[in-house]
Amino acid sequence: MASSLAAQLSQIAAKSTNQLDLKAQRIAHSQSLIFDRKVASIQDFDTVYQICYEGFQELCQLDSRFTAFERTIFSEQSKAEDRTQLTAAQNKELDVALEAFLALVGGRLLLNPAIKAVEWLVRRFRIHEYNTSFTILTFLPYYTTPLFLNLLAILPEDLTPTFKVLIPYKKSSINPPRHPLVHSATTNKPFLAALNSYVLQVSRQQAHHHALLAFWAGVYTEAVAGMLDASRSGRREIEKQKHEDIVISVLPILNDGFAMKNVSELIIGCYMVSVVLAQKASLQDKVLDSLMEAVAGSWTEETVESGLVCLAVLAQQKPETKLPRRALKAILRLDDIFKRLTELATQYKTSHLLLGVVAGCLDDLPRQKDTARLDLLSQIFQNQLLGEPEMSKAMALVLEATSSVHKDGAMSLDAQARLADLVQVFSQSESLRPTFQKTIAESSFDIAALEHNLQTVIDTAPAPRTVEDVEMEDVEKEEEQDHFSSTVESLSGEKLFKGSFLSTQSIPLFEKLAQAFTLAIGSKEKCQTFSDLAALGKNEAEKSPQYLSFFIRVFSGPYSMGTRVTALNMITSFLTSTESTNLDFQALLPFLLVTLTDPSERVRREAAAALAAVGSLYKKNRKGEDIWARDNLYGQPKDIKWLPTRDAQKVFERAVLPSLEECIFDATHIGKVLENTLRGVSVDANASELKKPLRLAFFTFLCSHAIELPLFTPKLGLLNILNRIDKAGGTTRTKELEPLLKTWRGFSEREVQDICEKERVPVSDVERQMVAIVTPKEKDSIMILLSNVSSHSESLRPSFIAAVFGRIKDIWARVAEDRQTVAAEQLFDISLGLSDLPLVNNSRDLLRSVQLPGSVLAQFLERIPVSLTDMEALGPAPKRRRTSQNNMIAMTVKDEAEFGKVMEKMTFILELVDSSSPETHPELADGLFQTLAALHHFKSQIQSGMSYLLSLTLGSLLAIVNRSKESAKAQFDTSVIRADLVVDCVRTTESPQVQNAALLLVAGLSVIAPELVLHSVMPIFTFMGSSVLRKDDDYSVSVIDQTIDQVVPALIQSLRDQKRDVVSGTSELLLSFTAAFEHIPSHRRLRLFHALITKLGTQDFLFAVLAMLANRYAMDKDVLVLMTGLVSDASAPVELTTYSKFLGLVSDSLKPKPGISQVLLGIGSDDGREPQKVAVDLLRDLAYLFKHSSLKVKMAKTFASEDEEAIRQLRSTFSQILEQVLTIGDSVQSMKLVSQANGDVLAALFGTLTLVDFLDTIEVLLERPNDELRRKVLRLLEGRLRQNPERDSASQIRVLDFLPTLVDIIRNSTDILLKHAAVACIDRIAEKYGKKDPSRVIGAAQVVASEACIGQTDDRIRIMGVLCLASMAETLGQVMIPALPEALSRSLALLELSLEEGKENSRLHDAVFSLFSALFVHIPYMISGPHLDKILLLSFKSANAEECEDDSRQEALKMMARKVDMAATLGAVDRNWQYAVQAGPVATKETLEVVSLAVEKHPKSATGKNIGVLSSILFKAFDLRREQLALGANATFDAADVDETEDALNDVTIKMIYKLNDTTFRPIFTKMLDWATSGLPKKDTQGSLARLTAFYKFLQVFFGTLQSIVTGYASYIIESVVSVLGKASPADKSTKALWLATMRLLRNAFEHDQDEFWQSPSHLNQISTPLINQLAHATNSSTAATVIAEAVPAITELAVAADSTDNHKELNTALMKFLRPSAGPNGKPAGGENPHTRLAALKAEQSLTEQLGEEWLALLPEMLPYISELMEDEDENVEREVRKWVKQIENVLGEKLDDMLT
């Protein structure tokens, strides 16, 4: 304790800065860089400052940046600074200044002024103590100088671990050598991190210097190299992980370094580190690409040479030659690039870099604007910068680019000429020709296609010489032979490959074999040697896929033409030589069909030969259906839709073989053949048509291969063929191949690149073919494509998105217009997203590039007013003609970002319209005028000209109008024209373009619609309607007010003086105002119209204004709001009078010769609307006014007043209105829409009444003879009661008083629909008011249950009545009992009727069961046993009725099980069980569900009381299996049904057991055992087996569920189980189920033994031997699998339960019998004679070893002899498994068994 305290005190003392410690202060003051300690100790700060300040001033003269420190650390005040007295914040601020100075002075430390200046920092601010790290790093580049020794001398003794490398040299006072510093950087992470951080900080401060950066670059490069070398490990995974950790730590430093382009030496240092990383670490392509882009992006003129060297080194490490795009662009932008590359190539390895440049020069040839890249390409080849192998690759790149250039677009003539010249150089140059000819020979380029693309002739390699000519090549051939021999020898040890070579993309063995096969090309002997390799399994080729799948992969893969031809030849040879004529080789068909599209004729010829060989095999095949490689062609079994052999033969003989000759000469012919074949058209004269089912099968066969094929080269070829076929045999390409598209979509960019790189297929080709899966003939083709990108856009590859949109563009024109509309809407919504997303840009580009239908453009235009409405509260009403536009209130758009989005959206829409030839879409006129109105309105709000948008809008309108002028009649509805807006555009805009467009548009409009532009018959109101009314400035408002006040009264008076009808006389005036409605600012509309009507006279004119507005705008929301406001201002009598006149106008409009309606509404005029449509609009608006005006409130107030006259007048007018409505209803019964609208008015009119008044009115109306009216009013009553009717006492009493009226209708009416309506009303009344006085409702219930209602023959009244009774049962409860007898009997009869065959009625069925459910819930005690029996019998019948839904029946049965007394429920089930079984599985399972619920939901006591009937049901159910077997072919249950039923039964039984105690259940169990074992005569073997199976399946659940609680019950069944084990067998179909049940029940019984039951010898001895003897059943692969799966786990669990060495030994002894062949007592083979038996025994030993471990291996000595024998077993499977067992034993014991086994 004391020593610890002393140590702590000494540490505190060492760090103390107590000012009283004078000795410590003197020592600290004497620390100096330039003075001796003694001299320094006697100097004061004034002296030191004077000396140091001189040095500082000299520094300032050298670099003006130092002057900034004159005011801080070199100020006069600094002499008094004491760091010990400063706060932490002040010290931190001081540290910033000190470090900035040190960074700046670091490059001049060898100068005396700099040392003097730093001396001040040491003496005054003690930087060596407080800023130790920064100080050391500043001096470190000078580690070899005396100056660094001086620094070491004054550094603190306790240096941090970061700088521990300096401690020995500080103590020894010597300069550190370089090696320790590099070693420290390599091994001491903090030191390296500090150095890197310091260098980056100094560089950012622009204080870098040569000494520092040279030191850092050397140390850091060596450190990184050292770290990578030190991380090398024998285990590749560990080494890779360590390398990744180092790379992750280095990359951020490089990233920061590359960002400082102007620090050249830092950049070069980063290049050095990058080179080390590339050479010593296995960097991924992605990392290399990023480094190369960073290097190329960082160089300047000073660093470009070093950067190119770095790029060359990095490129050499890349497996592929392609350079990153940014790096390539940076290279190509360099001046004198060829000169630079030439100089680079003379000093460094540049082959990959140059190949990358070559590939880059060839990239995207059609889009190259000039030939600069091709010029560079020519220079590279002509100066032969590449070696021969790389030259060949470069030539191949040129040829490949030239071959595929036509796919990407046309090449410019200059580019074509340059490439042609270059290829001519290849073929004519003496030095390049051999390489070029070799390249041609080893590749599969189509020379004819090359010549066509380049428009030149290519001299290919000469024909190979004969063997006699080749004498000088013997040595080379021998070397090749040696290479082949060594390769084959290395492969000779390979065992047969497990599976198919087509199973996955990456198979190392395949690569080795392919290399060997390539070496064998050209030599039959070598090919024969190669084909005999064990890994290929030629001898097993007919049974296993290895041999043929290898050659399939070769000829389908990216190999040279010769290699592929030889592979095809090997397959053909095999097919022609095979002796098995019953094999079906249809698996070859997809690959060979793809090969027929190969550009090489040689390849196609060999493919045709192979197909012919397959065809000949089909002819020999007489009976075989054995498809080669059916389950393992692609590894694990795949969902391949194989063709039946005869169908495959038909495909060959009718479609493929007749066209082979043409396919050889034409690579495209096979595509045409398949297309026509699958369409059902014969393309060849010798071919015959395939029937539709076969076409479908063939098509799905090919599609399934395309989906499941793991290799993308043949997959791409197959897609290329399939994508020609839209439909086949009733299915579509999209439907079949869409899973492939979804799978491809899910790949990441890296995965796609890896896939395509491995198989050398262009990513773009795969992307294009994948999206081409979607055919335009698919109904939702575009939406399918969009669904693949829209919801996953952030995670998808840009290339996939581009391909999808490219496909949409390709198929757009072939898609139906309605589908284009839906797609365009979605594309537009996508295009409004963030503009930098690929999905958004692609959507916009697509919309701009396709032909959009007019309907789509119209919908887009509709969005503009809506968008502007969202931006500000004063939005224009869409789709309405305006007549004025001013008087807007200025507003400010607060959200500028939102405004920008709206502007962008509008601009995009209008640009789309403008670019879509608007003159061809006259229907856009309406939307464009709306847009013009919205823009003009919004323009005034934001005080902006919006000239561009106006110009676009006017331009589109002008195009439409000009096109319309050319025809006799306008091509669009001229009523949408807004000439006032166009004029205002001229008046208000400052843009000449807009003005000119507007003037031209006005001129055009005057031609096609002069009445809208020129003066009308009432100039003043025309002017107001088209101009003034829409203004919103004060002056315009004043004009309107004065006009109304002065002109209108005079006009009215004039009409009266002339004795003209004032309403008809002012129709033009009213029309002007109503026409101007939508142009009037919304906040002024009500005030303006109210003033107008007031001046005209409300009682005389209100109806007319309302009618004209309704006629013109129908149900426009804004108009309805105005109309409601106008009528709400009127009194109740005036409002009712207005409605009466309004209805009179409706009646007039429907007359043959209309009167006033012709004047006001234009009825009967040439341009007037149809009277019925006018009537519908007027009636709908009137219904709205009744519902939403304040009439009801005003009438209530009048009725509540004491003004009798007013009340009388009101009732009179209301009655008149009602009479008018009824009269109209009578007259328009034949006019459906008018009648419906009139009915709405009637309903709304009644809605103005209280419920009491409503019922009073209905009673009167029900006395009318019109049944339609009576039905109508009852439906209105039901609707009102369905909502929230009045609940006051008076209303309730009145409603209940109304019940007798409804009952009377049900009893006496013959109109079924009227009865239906009455029952519906009773239903509502009973639900809403029944509980108020149930006794008044019961009478109605009895009538509904009687003959008069549900006793009718009409199903509608029956269903309504039954549902009404169900509602009443829920509401009335036991009060319902008087109606119950008749209700039950009739409903059961109805249910039975609804289930009659041919007369099924699901609605009636469901209604009756709903009634039963209600009765079971609310009065279950009233349902008697016979009723329950009847319900169950009918439910059984319902279960089998296909037309009936299950839900209602099942719900009723559940309610019965839950609510009805358990004894009654179980009794009914027991009585009717046999009928349930007769009905079938569904009824039986539902019956068991009833029992299950009854047991579950009732208490234990109820279960105990009813155990007798419950047992009876269970025994009957357990006997189901036996009964069904006895029925034989007449059985109603199949095996699966029986199993499912028994599962449900076992569940019920377990639930019952949970409710019983052991005393109650044990007798039942013994009874069950007796029932199962001895309950049948011995002769009934089949029945006994069935009962045992059912019982044992129950025991399996019994022991598995109740576990250790019931282990003791096993004593009852041991004898029976042993007996069963002696006679049941998994190989015997009749006993297999029993055997499986036995194994599983034993396993469960053993597994849960916690009472040592099975340890008892009496129990163990009985069961062990019979159980282990089950291994003898393993006599073939099928039974062995069953035994291993079922018996082995049971044996294992028995051993675990036995849990004693003696027991284990006994078990093992019995088990080992089966490990070796032996003879039984009767001389017959026994034990392990069969290898499958031995295998099963081995599996048991493995399981026991795994489960018991060392406990079981205590028996190892007696096992060893068996193991030794088994390791030499003649059966491979046994031998393999015993070796697994040996490894397992060795893992458990931790030692080898080799010594024990020898």
UniProtKB/Swiss-Prot annotation:
The keyword Membrane applies. HEAT repeats lie at residues 583-620, 1042-1079, 1249-1286, 1293-1331, 1754-1791. GO terms for cellular component: 90S preribosome; membrane; small-subunit processome; t-UTP complex. It comes from the Eukaryota. Its main location: nucleus. GO terms for biological process: maturation of SSU-rRNA from tricistronic rRNA transcript (SSU-rRNA, 5.8S rRNA, LSU-rRNA); positive regulation of transcription by RNA polymerase I. GO terms for molecular function: snoRNA binding. It is found in: Nucleus, Nucleolus; Membrane. Keywords: Membrane, Nucleus, Repeat, Ribonucleoprotein, Ribosome biogenesis, rRNA processing, Transmembrane, Transmembrane helix. It is a multi-pass membrane protein. InterPro entries: ARM-like, ARM-type_fold, BP28_C_dom, HEAT, HEAT_type_2, HEAT_Utp10/HEAT1, U3snoRNP10_N, UTP10. The chain crosses the membrane at residues 942-962, 998-1018. Component of the ribosomal small subunit (SSU) processome. Belongs to the HEATR1/UTP10 family. Involved in nucleolar processing of pre-18S ribosomal RNA. Involved in ribosome biosynthesis. This is U3 small nucleolar RNA-associated protein 10. It comes from Aspergillus fumigatus (strain ATCC MYA-4609 / CBS 101355 / FGSC A1100 / Af293) (Neosartorya fumigata).
